[in-house]
Amino acid sequence: AGFRKELQDNHPDVDLVNISYENEEQSIEDMLLEALEEYPDTAGIFCTNENVTESVLETVGRLEDKEIKIVGFDAGEVQIQAIRDGREYGTVCQNPYGMGYAAAVAALRAASGQTVDNWIDPGYQWVDRNNIDVEEKDGTIFNLGEKFGNKAGH
C-alpha cells in the first residue's frame, strides 16, 4: 500500500502495471517473463525481498536487449555484488542492529510493566553504487562487521 501511495502521490508519470506475489504455483521467473511479455516496455522492477530480487536478477540477466532497473529489498551477498556490478540499481536495507535493539527495549519495557509503542521503526537505508562501500552504515547491511571491520556488526 505504501509503495502504491508513494507512486500515486509523488510520481504520477510512473505507471504501476503489474503486481505479482511469490507463490508455490508459479516461479518468480515464470511470473516475470509473463509480465514482461504483457508489458514489454517495462523500465523498472521493485522486488520486496532478497529471494525475489535474486530470482529477478538472474532472469533479467538472461534476457537480451532489456534495460530494466531493478530495485531490491534487503542486502544479501548476491544483491551487494549486483549493486557493485551495476545489475541492481539499489536496495532498501533493513537495520538489523536497530531491530535487535528495539526488540530488546520493547521486551524489557513489557517485562517491567511499562507500555510499549504500537509502532516501532528501527530504520532503513537506501544503498546504491554511490554508498555501497561507505563504512558508516550503522549496521544496515548484514555481515557489516566482517565487511567493514566494525565491532559487533554496528
Give the residues covered by each predicted segment.
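Hydrophobic alpha-helical
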Residues: F3, V17, Y21-A82
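Short beta-strand elements at the ligand-binding edges of bilobed clamshell
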Residues: I19, D85-Y97
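Extracytoplasmic substrate-binding proteins
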Residues: A1-D13, V17
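Conserved beta-strand segments of alpha/beta enzyme cores
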Residues: D15-V17, K69, G90, Q125
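Hinge/cleft segment of the Venus flytrap/periplasmic-binding protein
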Residues: E6-N10, G98-H154
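Hydrophobic alpha-helical segments within soluble ligand-binding/sensing domains
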Residues: A1-K5, S27-E29, A75-Q79, Q94-S112
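Short, structurally constrained coil/turn elements
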Residues: N10-D13, E38, E64, I120
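Flexible loop/hinge segments that line or gate small-molecule binding clefts
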Residues: G76-Y89, N130, E136
